[in-house]
Structure formats: C-alpha cells, structure tokens
Amino acid sequence: MTSKSWIRWLGAPLIALVLTIAPPVHAVEDARKVSVVSFGLFGDQGVFRSEATGAAQVVAGRFGSGPIDVQYNSKKGGGATIEALAKSLQVAANGLDTENDILFLILTSHGSPAGLAVKAGRLTQTLTPSNLADMLARTGVRHKVVIISACYSGVFIPLLANPDLLVITAADANHPSFGCEDKAKWTYFGDAFFNIALRQARSLKDAFVVARALVKKRELREHFEPSNPLMAGGANVEPLLIVRP
C-alpha cells in the first residue's frame, strides 16, 4: 500500500485534524544543532538496515542541522554493536553544545522484554534498558530524543523517559510490533511514523498520533493484536523543535 493509499484509508477527518503539509522542520531560531545517530542492530534481516538509513534521512531532512551517523549489521557482520553505539553517542555528544543542542537516537531491531537484539554475523548481544540509559547519561547532553522500532520496546520507557528525554516506541512493554520481513524497506511502525507521518507533521507529537492510528488500522486489518506504540517524556525537548516560518 502506498503512502497516499495509507492516508486515504485512515480517513480524512483525523488527517485534517493532525497532519498538515508543512515546510521543513528545523530547530528554533537560535540555530540549535540536531545530531542524528541511527543503528540497525539485527543483521539477519535487511529491513533494519533500510529502516535505520531511511529514518535518519527523514529526521535529518525535517530537523537536521548537524551530523548524521548511520550504522547497521548484516548476515556477515557489521559494526552496529553495543560498544559501537556507546562510542557513536559520545562522538556525537562531543560535537554538541550539551545544554542547548539535541541528540536524536534511532534504534531498529527485534526486541524482547529483556531489550533489543544485536546480531552481527556470529556476534549476538542484548541492549538492555539499563545499558542504554547509562550510555545516554554519559553523553552529558541535556536534550535527547530516542525512537525505538522493535517488539516490546516499551520496556525502555521507565528508565529513559523524563522531561529532557523524549521516548517513542513501536510497541508497549507487552506486545510485539510487526513488519520485519527481510526485503521490506520499513517495519509497520517505521513506515507509518518516519515514511508517512513525520514527512508532513509539524511536530513529533503530531507525527506520533497519526502513526499510531495508521499502525493500529493496519494491524487490525491483518488480524494482529495491536502493538500499542507509546510516547513518553520530553516536555522540555519537543518545544525546541518547531516549524520555521
């Protein structure tokens, strides 16, 4: 189904209420820098490579005024490991004004109640909520956005979300998400949030509201139990990202 078909199918009233055709979104007028780090962690399926790359491009196009770091794994190997993620976050942080700029992290993979699966060739790891919370704290960057596209990704919210850290997840802590086919370009959530809603919405919140409705509609049509995407925290972060007049 194309993006236009998705929007027609969801229905005009909700789209008219939430989604507007907008000029590019940028940081506020004081030239706030937004640095994007995007990791496709599970190498056995190409959808995570595609989604990590595509999501970073969309976010940078809507918000970007800083560097982009995209890493992913394949069946043969790759550098998107837990250690590499910690290093990439620190490198990104070193180029930011820690009080004023924004660190934007995107993670896409399979997930479980324990965390996110990392698979690079024969290497297997689990990125836990406590692992990620520690990494983010060590960056010293105040304002952060974390978007996690994975099953059970809501498990990350309790340890991550706070007024300075906005967290968006593809599912709650008790449900899988869908669309992890090897040759797909996007997961269901990635398609709805990054590929459709965020390209047009005026804010992350608006994009999330539309994406959540799109995902639920698709899941019900395909007889899946809804994954219940979540958004939490970020009261001090989201206002810093606005549409430039």
Language model feature labels by segment:
Residues A31-S35, G64-I68, T98-L103, G140-V145, ...:
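Loop/turn elements at helix/coil->beta-strand transitions in domains of secreted/extracellular proteins
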Residues Q45-R49, G78-I82, P113-K119, G154-P158, ...:
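Extracytoplasmic/secreted cell-surface and envelope-processing proteins
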Residues P23-N100, G179, A184-T187, I242-P245:
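Boundary/activation segment at the start of structured domains
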Residues A150-E238:
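Active-site-proximal C-terminal subdomain of hydrolase catalytic domains
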Residues L10-I21:
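Bacterial N-terminal signal peptides
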Residues A92-G121, K144, A150-P176:
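Active-site microenvironments of hydrolase-like enzyme catalytic domains
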Residues S109-T139:
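A short, glycine/acidic-enriched catalytic loop
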Residues M1-W6:
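N-terminal secretory signal peptides that target proteins for export/translocation
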